[in-house]
């Protein structure tokens, strides 16, 4: 709308009269005055006469007010602050302060980029403004006016959802500038010195010094509108120079490249609004007319002080961040920063960090991303180098004789290399449309598992363009038997041929500029062939830009999708890879918050942010938030994105939401420009990793798993274990309530900001990046893959480099399809017994390490532990075991022998052979580590250098120790089962030989495992123990060149329970000649995560007591007191809930388990995923508690997440479960070798029913009986102690009499058990009721027999106790596997031995003849005379015969 003249205004307002009549108010023709006509005729005459026409200029009143620049700025600011819309219902109509003619500029800009197919520009959708209602006149005039005033309106079109238009606009944005600005370095405006690096810290405003004028408001930026972007802006500028004049000239800012460091204007926008992303104005005043119920400043402060933690209490060095001057670099991307190379020619030198290839869309092309030095700016900036024309390289192995492919039979025609060439040229190239190729004859070596391939032979090497599809892997011809290299990737060929081992400096000769931008990097170059790229050695790496970020999501209750509501990031712009991590680990930060769709921001939230001087951007919608984050990522250009669970959850959610919200230029999350987002949600995370190519992902969860062992890898646990501090967890269901008050929302943002800092601190504490760089340089793979874990790939690349350098053909990659995993595969071995296999677990491919049978018991004398240093790598070196040296059986023959019991072990190589490649590579690693450790011992070393050396030696050790793994890993590219079997065979042989040697020295070996042995010294003198250890060490080491055994430790006392399970007090000598002890646990329940903390603490107490120097009686007494106390505490509810939490890891995604209900951790994991906030997946640890919920379900189906227990009143901790199946088994197993403590006693002390533990005790006693030579050596009392006593009611008084022997009493008071009733007042004798007694015995015997034939089986695992009658199909060597726990075997609840013993017991208690024979003669005579008359003896024999009768049936 243009400015309106004053007279026109009057005409417009008087156009309609008050009468409302159309006729009366219609415009009339006005009569012209006569004077006017005369003047006009006069002018016409003069014109005809030839006189010049003189134009008379009338004086017009100006419609514009002229002001200076300062006044104009104030006027615009006043307009912005003025809320001039009355009662807009909060819909967010905005006045941005610009003049009306500014809209024309904006519309013109839209016309240039948003013109549709009809040639008309689509204008921006605008919000409807609520206006006062006006009564419509009911006359014909209103109809005419309305129809005349209508304009045709175009249908609203969402430009952001038009992918084709987006691609066109992206191409338009890449115009080449005519004049490129020179590279300049512009310092960014400094923040105030009082600002804290924490955006949530509260500071009092400082007074402005005199002489300086404080600006009352900060500069406002115009709204963000997409416009065509010049090439210089796109590829060079991270941000525009902060000059107001330049900004006013440009008028608009392009969304994705805007400078987001300053506060930005925003208002609420429609979710469907496609064009502009706006950010709330942090500096604007609150909307007038809104009444606040409480003072926001006072309320926030008091709430934060009383409840919410304050980040300002952290030890933050404010000077470090405040002194950092962010340098924004402008570069001319049309002129590459070339330098002089080794040959004095201009080359492009850069440090490569990451590589990417797209074999389907751009075959034969590799993108290298890294950093390049810009001399004019004195800094490193990002760059992308496109390496083209990487050819496929194939090797054809010629046959000896030509074969007929139809029949498969050989002919008599010998083959020459020319025949191979002709077959490829005439048949293969034509069939697979290879129009152009190169070939030559080469000599290559081969040393792998394909049979009938010679060790050395001539091959036909064929090279052709990668744009032609690859040949089949199993291709065979008449003249050639094998083709190698069909599926080798372009990236692998490039890295191997150019000998590039991990991130390093590269130089590109003859670099070419690209016509169209392919990346978001500052510089882009192209190498037309891979030979133009060369390695520059021994130059230190440049500093990188590292961004740590954290985000908070909420699940939409309608569509159950995760929506991002807030993000925080910390950035360090010069993070070194070869020095100690910087302190603090970040220099700048940003935070952005949005809101769920069904929430509103708290009242005066912006005002609180403003008053507290917080750097928080407020986004009206999730789309705005995501756009802001992408713009920030593009501007800051981080090389590494750091997060926790970023690969398993956050990155997938982030990309899904970007895609869902149609945020433009999604690919800025990485460095490669792409329009189509890769497929997300795959289990391998392949699409998510590809989306960020060029920016490495560092997931601290993955890194920590490789470096340290934790109970779980949740962020809270890592913060506690590594940073030794506490992290507060905000439940997902509480997030929505955080939007009720500004203080609550600020606390949420503070929490997210803290998480980002925790993540960064964990990364620095473990030196994740320097270690990953060193490992990558050693292995020669890609650093982004190293950060993702996976040792197999690192070993693969290390061997690939080694075999390529030695002119070997390497094995092709195989595509493996893992078989469907069966239920129960996720569980571990039972009690470490390698003979017990899990359900569905196939037999081991080859025998592993030897584990000697332990001599179970408690040792209170010094135990010596000897250990071979790096046993398997040392064996490989000692015996020269390699692909190239060991003769293996052909794979067909090997498969035929796989099912046989006897394992085929290849012979050792000839000692005179040259060292193979595998032992040579391991020796290199070992020797390099020794050199680095020697360097570390130098005096006066720089601390940074010491750290660098330490990281390098750790990387060398990790790599060397994992080398053996690639031989035995069936999915490895270098899998060689015979070699792995030979290594483990020699390991078993060496351990057994060492044991025999020690025994010959008259020493007792009590245990041994793979590479270590334990020796009982029977000494209490530590000095003598070390002398003895050195003696054994010297004797063993004499036998080998490279194998070394060493003293690994001395135990003061040892509790050896079974294989791989022991507890010990380790001796650590001190400088003063004494020693201290430290407790060490191996394989016990209390070191496993799937036991609750209460059980672990109890187990630790018991072990501490057993290992102490106290007497046995004191130890038993202390354990008894402690268990009684724990039982009472659990029943009283005085134990915190956290002590009951059980942690168990998922081996696959929760939805992939077939029996979800019976696995408690899977059941809880599914519930967690359904709630939103986080997603648990394979490899994650799930915490749960077993509760009483009023149902009769088994304990495994009554598992709940801890937060469920807190929220649901009907849930309570199942105390019986924790006492019987958590605490009892742990303590019982530890106390098993201790005299005076058994499972029944432990149950009694814990307040449990001891009868349910007698079955387990009985089976243990059966095993002990077998060891002792059977029941023959046991007394009657021992033999029948667990039998059910015979009970019979007295017919006279009804008292229950219990019989367990022929006699009652002892000595002089001995009498027959049937002589009198146990009731003193009853005078009747049971011997007079023999018929009733006989009938009761028959009924009891029948009941026992029925119990046996019921066939109930019970799991012998105390934590399971599953009862089942159906015999399962899965068996181990020890019996049928329990289908519930899949860990232990099932035993008969009432075995045949139990029945037989019970029947023998019934016979025994009535066998008077046998009982009398065992008595001394004088006692026997006395009893016969007094009690055992012939009639009584006859009665006893009758009852005994009943038992004899049933025993005769048992066979």
From Swiss-Prot:
- Give its E.C. classification number: 2.7.7.7
Set out the biological process GO terms recorded for this chain's protein: DNA biosynthetic process; DNA repair; DNA replication; DNA replication initiation; DNA replication, synthesis of primer; DNA strand elongation involved in DNA replication; DNA synthesis involved in DNA repair; double-strand break repair via nonhomologous end joining
Q: Which reaction does it catalyse?
A: DNA(n) + a 2'-deoxyribonucleoside 5'-triphosphate = DNA(n+1) + diphosphate
Its recorded name reads DNA polymerase alpha catalytic subunit
Q: Which residues carry this modification: Phosphothreonine?
A: 413
- GO MF: chromatin binding; DNA binding; DNA replication origin binding; DNA-directed DNA polymerase activity; double-stranded DNA binding; nucleotide binding; protein kinase binding; purine nucleotide binding
Print the miscellaneous field.
In eukaryotes there are five DNA polymerases: alpha, beta, gamma, delta, and epsilon which are responsible for different reactions of DNA synthesis.
Compartment(s): Nucleus; Cytoplasm, Cytosol
Locate the Phosphoserine modifications and list their residues: 192, 196, 215
Query: Matching InterPro entries, A to Z?
Result: DNA-dir_DNA_pol_B, DNA-dir_DNA_pol_B_CS, DNA-dir_DNA_pol_B_exonuc, DNA-dir_DNA_pol_B_multi_dom, DNA/RNA_pol_sf, DNA_pol_a_cat_su_N, DNA_pol_B_thumb, DNA_pol_palm_dom_sf
Xref: PANTHER family: DNA POLYMERASE ALPHA CATALYTIC SUBUNIT
The organism's lineage is:
Eukaryota, Metazoa, Chordata, Craniata, Vertebrata
ZnF (CysA-type) spans are 1290-1320
Q: Which domain of life is it from?
A: Eukaryota
Q: Which PROSITE patterns match?
A: DNA_POLYMERASE_B
Q: Which residues carry this modification: N6-acetyllysine?
A: 230
Q: Which cysteines are joined by disulfide bonds?
A: none
- Which residue stretches belong to region DNA-binding? 657-722, 1252-1383
Biased-composition ranges for Polar residues?
Answer: 193-204
Motif CysB motif at which residues?
A: 1355-1381
User: What are the protein's UniProt keywords?
Assistant: Acetylation, Cytoplasm, DNA replication, DNA-binding, DNA-directed DNA polymerase, Metal-binding, Nucleotidyltransferase, Nucleus, Phosphoprotein, Transferase, Zinc, Zinc-finger
Q: Describe, as the record does, how this protein assembles with itself and its partners.
A: Component of the alpha DNA polymerase complex (also known as the alpha DNA polymerase-primase complex) consisting of four subunits: the catalytic subunit POLA1, the regulatory subunit POLA2, and the primase complex subunits PRIM1 and PRIM2 respectively. Interacts with PARP1; this interaction functions as part of the control of replication fork progression. Interacts with MCM10 and WDHD1; these interactions recruit the polymerase alpha complex to the pre-replicative complex bound to DNA.
Regarding protein family, the annotation reads: Belongs to the DNA polymerase type-B family.
Q: Which organism is it from?
A: Rattus norvegicus
């Amino acid at each position: 709308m243009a400015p309106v003249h004053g007279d026109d205004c009057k005409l417009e307002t008087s156009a309609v009269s008050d009468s409302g009549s159309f006729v009366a108010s219609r415009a009339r023709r006005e009569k012209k005055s006569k004077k006017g006509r005369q003047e006009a005729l006069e002018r016409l005459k003069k014109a005809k006469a030839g006189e010049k026409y003189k134009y008379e200029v009338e004086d017009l009143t100006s419609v514009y007010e002229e002001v200076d620049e300062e006044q104009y700025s104030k006027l615009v600011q006043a307009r912005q602050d003025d809320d001039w819309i009355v009662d807009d219902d909060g819909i967010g109509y905005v006045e941005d302060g610009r003049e009306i003619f500014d809209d024309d500029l904006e519309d013109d800009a839209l016309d240039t980029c948003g013109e549709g197919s009809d040639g008309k520009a689509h204008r921006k959708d605008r919000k409807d403004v609520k206006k006062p209602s006006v009564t419509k006149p009911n006359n014909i005039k209103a109809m005419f006016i309305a129809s005349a005033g209508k304009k045709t309106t175009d249908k609203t079109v969402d430009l952001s959802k038009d992918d084709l238009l987006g691609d066109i606009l992206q191409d338009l944005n890449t115009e080449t500038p005519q004049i490129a600005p020179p590279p300049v370095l512009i310092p960014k405006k400094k923040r105030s010195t009082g600002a804290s690096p924490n955006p949530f810290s509260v500071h009092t405003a400082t007074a402005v010094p005199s002489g300086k004028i404080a600006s009352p408001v900060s500069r406002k930026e115009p709204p963000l509108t997409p416009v065509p972007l010049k090439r210089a802006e796109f590829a060079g500028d991270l941000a525009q120079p902060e000059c107001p004049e330049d900004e006013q000239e440009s008028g608009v800012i392009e969304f994705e490249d805007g400078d987001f460091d300053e506060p930005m204007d925003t208002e609420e926008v429609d979710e469907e609004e496609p064009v502009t992303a706006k950010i709330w104005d942090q500096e604007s005043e609150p909307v007038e007319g809104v009444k606040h119920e409480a003072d926001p400043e006072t309320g926030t402060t008091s709430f934060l002080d009383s409840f919410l933690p304050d980040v300002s209490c952290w030890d933050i060095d404010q000077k470090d961040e405040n002194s950092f001057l962010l340098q924004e670099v402008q570069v001319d991307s049309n002129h590459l920063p070339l330098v002089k190379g080794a040959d004095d020619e201009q080359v492009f030198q850069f440090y490569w960090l990451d590589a990417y290839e797209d074999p389907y869309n751009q075959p034969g092309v590799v993108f290298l991303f890294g950093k390049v030095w810009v001399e004019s700016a004195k800094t490193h900036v990002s760059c992308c180098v496109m390496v083209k024309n990487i050819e496929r390289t194939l090797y054809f192995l010629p046959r000896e004789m030509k074969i007929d492919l139809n029949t498969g039979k050989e002919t008599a025609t010998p083959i020459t290399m020319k025949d191979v060439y002709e077959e490829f040229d005439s048949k293969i190239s034509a069939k697979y449309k290879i129009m152009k190729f190169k070939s030559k004859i080469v000599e290559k070596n081969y040393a792998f598992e394909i049979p009938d391939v010679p060790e050395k032979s001539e091959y036909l090497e064929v090279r052709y363009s990668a744009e032609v599809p690859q040949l089949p892997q199993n291709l065979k011809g008449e003249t050639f038997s094998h083709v190698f290299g069909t599926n080798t990737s372009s990236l692998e060929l490039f890295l191997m041929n150019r000998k590039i081992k991990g991130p390093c400096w590269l130089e590109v000769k003859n670099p070419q500029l690209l016509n169209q931008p392919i990346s978001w990097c500052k510089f882009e170059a192209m190498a037309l062939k891979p030979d133009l790229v060369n390695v520059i050695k021994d130059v230190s790496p440049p500093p990188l830009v590292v961004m740590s970020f954290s985000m908070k999501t909420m699940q939409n209750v309608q569509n159950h999708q995760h929506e991002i509501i807030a993000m925080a990031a910390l950035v360090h712009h010069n993070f070194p890879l070869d020095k100690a991590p910087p302190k603090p680990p970040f220099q700048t930060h940003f935070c952005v918050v949005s809101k769920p769709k069904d929430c509103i921001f708290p009242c005066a939230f912006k005002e609180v942010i403003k008053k507290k001087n917080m750097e928080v951007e407020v986004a009206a919608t999730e789309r705005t938030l995501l756009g802001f984050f992408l713009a920030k990522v593009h501007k800051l250009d981080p090389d590494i994105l750091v997060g926790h669970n970023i690969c398993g959850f956050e990155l997938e959610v982030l990309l899904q939401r970007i895609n869902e919200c149609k945020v433009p230029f999604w690919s800025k999350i990485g460095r490669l420009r792409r329009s189509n987002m890769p497929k997300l949600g795959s289990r391998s995370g392949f699409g998510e990793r590809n989306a960020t190519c060029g920016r490495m992902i560092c997931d601290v969860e993955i890194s920590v798993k490789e470096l340290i062992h934790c109970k779980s890898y949740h962020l809270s646990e890592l913060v506690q274990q590594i940073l030794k501090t506490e992290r507060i967890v905000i439940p997902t269901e509480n997030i929505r309530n955080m939007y009720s008050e500004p203080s609550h929302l600020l606390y949420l943002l503070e929490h997210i900001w803290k998480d980002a800092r925790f993540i960064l601190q964990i990364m620095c504490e473990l030196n994740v990046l320097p270690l990953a760089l060193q490992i990558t340089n050693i292995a020669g793979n890609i650093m982004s893959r190293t950060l993702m874990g996976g040792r197999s790939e690192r070993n693969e690349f290390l061997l690939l480099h080694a075999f390529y350098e030695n002119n070997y053909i390497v094995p092709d990659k195989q595509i493996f399809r893992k078989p469907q995993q069966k239920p129960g595969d996720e569980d571990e071995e039972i009690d470490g017994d390698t003979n017990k296999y899990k359900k569905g677990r196939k037999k081991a491919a080859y025998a592993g390490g030897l584990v000697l049978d332990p001599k179970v018991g408690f040792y209170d004398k010094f135990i010596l532990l000897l250990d071979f240093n790096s046993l398997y790598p040392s064996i490989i070196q000692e015996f020269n075991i390699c692909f190239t040296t060991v003769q293996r059986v052909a794979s067909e023959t090997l498969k035929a022998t796989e099912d046989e019991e006897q394992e085929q072990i290849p012979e050792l190589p000839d000692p005179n052979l040259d060292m193979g490649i595998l032992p040579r590579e391991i020796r290199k690693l070992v020797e390099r580590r020794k050199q680095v450790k020697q360097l570390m011992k130098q005096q006066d070393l720089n601390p940074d250098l010491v750290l660098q050396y330490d990281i390098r030696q750790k990387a060398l050790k990790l790599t060397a120790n994992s080398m053996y793994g690639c031989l035995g890993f069936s999915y490895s590219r270098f899998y060689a089962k015979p070699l792995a079997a030979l290594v483990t065979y020699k390991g078993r042989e060496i351990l057994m030989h060492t044991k025999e040697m020690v025994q010959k020295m008259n020493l007792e070996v009590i245990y041994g495992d793979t590479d270590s042995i334990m020796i009982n010294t029977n000494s209490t003198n530590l000095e003598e123990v070390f002398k003895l250890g050195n003696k054994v060490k010297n004797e063993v080491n004499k036998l080998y060149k490279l194998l070394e055994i060493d003293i690994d430790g001395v135990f003061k006392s040892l509790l050896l329970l079974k294989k791989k399970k022991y507890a010990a007090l380790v001796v650590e000598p001190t400088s003063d000649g004494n020693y201290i002890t430290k407790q060490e646990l191996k394989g016990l329940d209390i070191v496993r995560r799937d036991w609750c903390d209460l059980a672990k603490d109890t187990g630790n107490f018991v072990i501490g007591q057993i290992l102490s120097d106290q007497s046995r009686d004191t130890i038993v007494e202390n354990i008894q007191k402690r268990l009684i106390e724990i039982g009472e505490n659990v029943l009283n509810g005085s134990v915190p809930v956290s002590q009951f939490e059980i942690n168990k890891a998922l081996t696959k995604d929760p939805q992939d388990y077939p029996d979800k209900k019976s696995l408690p951790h899977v059941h809880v994991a599914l519930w967690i995923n359904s709630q939103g906030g986080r997603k648990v997946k394979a490899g994650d640890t799930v915490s749960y508690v077993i509760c009483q919920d009023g149902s009769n379900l088994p304990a495994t189906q009554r598992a709940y997440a801890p937060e469920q227990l807190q929220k649901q009143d009907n849930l309570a901790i199942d105390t019986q479960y924790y006492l019987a199946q958590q605490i009892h088994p742990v303590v019982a197993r530890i106390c098993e070798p201790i005299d005076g403590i058994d499972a029944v006693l432990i149950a009694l002390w814990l307040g449990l029913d001891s009868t349910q533990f007698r079955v387990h005790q009985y089976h243990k006693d059966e095993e002990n009986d077998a060891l002792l030579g059977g029941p023959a050596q046991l007394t009657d009392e021992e033999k029948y102690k667990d039998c059910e006593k015979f009970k019979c009611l007295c017919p006279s008084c009804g008292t229950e009499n219990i019989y367990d022997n022929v006699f009652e009493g002892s000595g002089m008071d001995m009498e027959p058990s049937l002589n009198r009733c146990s009731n003193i007042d009853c005078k009747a004798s049971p011997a007079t009721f023999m018929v009733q007694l006989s009938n009761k015995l028959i009924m009891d015997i029948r009941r026992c027999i029925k119990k046996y034939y019921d066939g109930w089986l019970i799991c012998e695992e105390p934590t399971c106790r599953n009862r089942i009658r159906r015999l399962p199909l899965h068996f181990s060597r020890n019996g049928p596997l329990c289908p519930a726990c899949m860990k232990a075997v099932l035993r008969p609840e009432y075995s045949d031995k139990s029945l037989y013993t019970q029947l023998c017991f019934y016979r025994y208690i009535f066998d008077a003849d046998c009982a009398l024979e065992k008595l001394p003669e004088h006692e026997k005579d006395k009893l016969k005379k007094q009690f055992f008359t012939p009639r009584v003896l006859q009665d006893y024999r009758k009852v005994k015969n009943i038992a004899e009768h049933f025993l005769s049936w048992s066979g």
